[in-house]
Structure formats: structure tokens, C-alpha cells
Amino acid sequence: MIFPAIDLRAGQSVRLYQGDFKQATLINPDPVVQAQQINAAGLQQLHMVDLDGAKSGRPENFATITAIRQAFTGTIELGGGIRTYELATRYLELGIDRLILGSVALTDPRLVKRLLSEFGGERIVIGLDGTNGYVAIKGWLEQSQTKMSTLMKTMTTSGAKHFIVTDVARDGTMQGPNLALYQELQAQVPTANLIASGGVRNLTDVQVLQASGFKDVIIGKALAEGGVTLAELAGVTEC
């Protein structure tokens, strides 16, 4: 599946460079319109992140997320600051299809295990973000001492099936995806489904990832800068 990305900051769609909040580029002042454009192109998946929430641990763009959920007819996965059971269930009740749990997978694994047990591995997805193989947390503002592979194995034991893997150093850079990282993690946990995120430049990158076995790909900056079009991505999903 192809997941166009919308990252929310102060109610607008932006892109960060290597997760740096000081290096934000405005993509669309009205992310609802952006979501509708994705739908209109024939794409039925949307990856969304509350960047402000990722920093604060609170729902900072709830009204915008609600409006996008009402406007977008397909599947929405959402991450960013989901660190309590109450917020997780609030988003699920809103109609969000899949929740992405990042920092909390490291800081509160019992909560993640509870959510996985209650809602299942199809609705609870683990966001595995890292630098040099180590997990980054709290909106990528902190780097932990835990290896990405270690956390992945722990979460698999807890019932996780899907992992969105992002090399922070590649995110928003248009330098190409870190295929070697995906292959290394996949080799360590063969049963997991890895969703590639970060660095995708064009349609060729998508095709290389899929040919390598990584069928699910998230695309953000390449869409904003014209490296790939929604129409091209819609064609990929039809193959």
C-alpha cells in the first residue's frame, strides 16, 4: 500500500527536515483540502502525524484531525503524542483506523501491550524511528540507548505486526530510503511487516522498495516537491 503523508503543525500541513522543528516547510495551509486531493487521485490510504502532539504528548491538532477524518473516505493511520489509553481510545472512537505508537512503545510498553491485546495488531502500529540504529523518541528530540531491533522484537512478542520504520537522518531529505536498514530489521524479525518511511525521492524508489519486499511505503516530501505525483502513486496501487 502507498501512504501519502500529512504532517500537522498548528493546523497546517508541513514537512520537517530530519525531524528538525526549526526546519519546517509549509506544504498546505489547509490539510483538509490536501486530504481530499489524495482521495480524488484514487488513493485510499493516508498517513498522518500530529507533530505538535509528538512534542507535547497531548492532542494539539484534534480539530484538524477530526475534519480530515470526516473528509477522507479511506484508511487513516495517525501518530504523534499518543501516550495514554484515553487518547488512544478517543482517536479510535473518532474513526481513525490505525494508531501509530512511537515513544510510548519504549517508555510504557505495558500500555502498548494493553492496546494491542484490546484492539489487535491491525489497528495498533508501532512507529520505529531511529538514528544510527537506536530508537529516537519524543518527536525525535531525544535518542535512547535502545536498539531499533531490540524494541521491534519486544513489541512483536507483545502482539505487534506492523512497524513503520523511519531513519530520522533520511526523513525529509530526498536522499533515498535506507533499504539496508529495512533489510537488516526484516532479517531479525522475519514475521513483521515493515512499512518504509523517509527519504523516498521518486517512483523508482517506491518500485525498488516494493521489489525488495517492502510493499507498504509512506511518501511525504517527494509529493510536495514534485518528485512523484499522486497519479503515479495511484498507478502503483493498481499494479
UniProtKB/Swiss-Prot annotation:
GO molecular function: 1-(5-phosphoribosyl)-5-[(5-phosphoribosylamino)methylideneamino]imidazole-4-carboxamide isomerase activity
Active-site residues per Swiss-Prot or TrEMBL entry: 7 (proton acceptor), 129 (proton donor)
Disulfide-bonded cysteines: none
Keyword Ribonucleoprotein tagged: no
EC number, as in UniProt: 5.3.1.16
An annotated GO cellular component: cytoplasm
CDD domains: HisA (cd04732)
Classification via Pfam families: His_biosynth
Keyword Transcription set for record: no
Listed GO biological process terms: L-histidine biosynthetic process; L-tryptophan biosynthetic process
Keywords in alphabetical order: Amino-acid biosynthesis, Cytoplasm, Histidine biosynthesis, Isomerase
PANTHER family: 1-(5-PHOSPHORIBOSYL)-5-[(5-PHOSPHORIBOSYLAMINO)METHYLIDENEAMINO] IMIDAZOLE-4-CARBOXAMIDE ISOMERASE
Family: Belongs to the HisA/HisF family.
Stated name of the protein: 1-(5-phosphoribosyl)-5-[(5-phosphoribosylamino)methylideneamino] imidazole-4-carboxamide isomerase
Encoding gene, per UniProt annotation: hisA
